[in-house]
Structure formats: structure tokens, C-alpha cells
UniProtKB/Swiss-Prot annotation:
Expressed by the venom gland. Residues 1-21 form the signal peptide. InterPro entries: Huwentoxin-1 (IPR011696). It is found in: Secreted. Residues 22-31 form a propeptide. Inhibits preferentially tetrodotoxin-insensitive sodium currents (Nav) on rat cardiac myocytes (IC(50) is 0.26 uM) and has weaker inhibition activity toward tetrodotoxin-sensitive sodium currents on rat dorsal root ganglion (DRG) sensory neurons (IC(50) is 0.83 uM) and on cockroach dorsal unpaired median (DUM) neurons (IC(50) is 1.19 uM). Has no significant effect on potassium currents on DRG neurons. SUPFAM superfamilies: omega toxin-like. This is U7-theraphotoxin-Cg1a.
Length: 63
């Protein structure tokens, strides 16, 4: 019984992670700007509320 519950919880977590990954991939192709953990450059700047960190060249959230 405990094993079944663990498998169900693991399965739900896996489905959630997969759906988040697919959603992030779709957002990346739809937008002309970078969102969280997107590579940033002069050609593709970060979206509003995100800033490009020069050391890592990724967009991160900034208030």
C-alpha cells in the first residue's frame, strides 16, 4: 500500500515537471524576449521584470 502511494505521488510529480517543461518551451518560442533562465543577448533581451546577468548571460527575476 505504501509503495503504491509513493508511485502515485512520483507519477504526479513527473507529470507536473513534464507539463512545466512543455509550457516553458512554448513560451520561449512565442516571445521575442527572454523569461526565467533564458539565455539573453543584445538580439534577445529579457522580458519585463527580468534582467540579464552578465556573468551567466541568463535572464533572472528582478523586482
Amino acid at each position: 500500500m505504501k509503495t503504491s502511494i509513493l508511485f502515485v505521488i512520483f507519477g504526479l510529480a513527473l507529470l507536473f515537471a513534464l507539463s512545466v517543461a512543455i509550457e516553458m518551451e512554448e513560451e520561449e518560442t512565442d516571445r521575442g524576449c527572454g523569461t526565467m533562465w533564458s539565455p539573453c543577448s543584445t538580439e534577445k533581451p529579457c522580458c519585463d521584470n527580468f534582467s540579464c546577468q552578465p556573468a551567466i548571460k541568463w535572464c533572472i527575476w528582478s523586482p
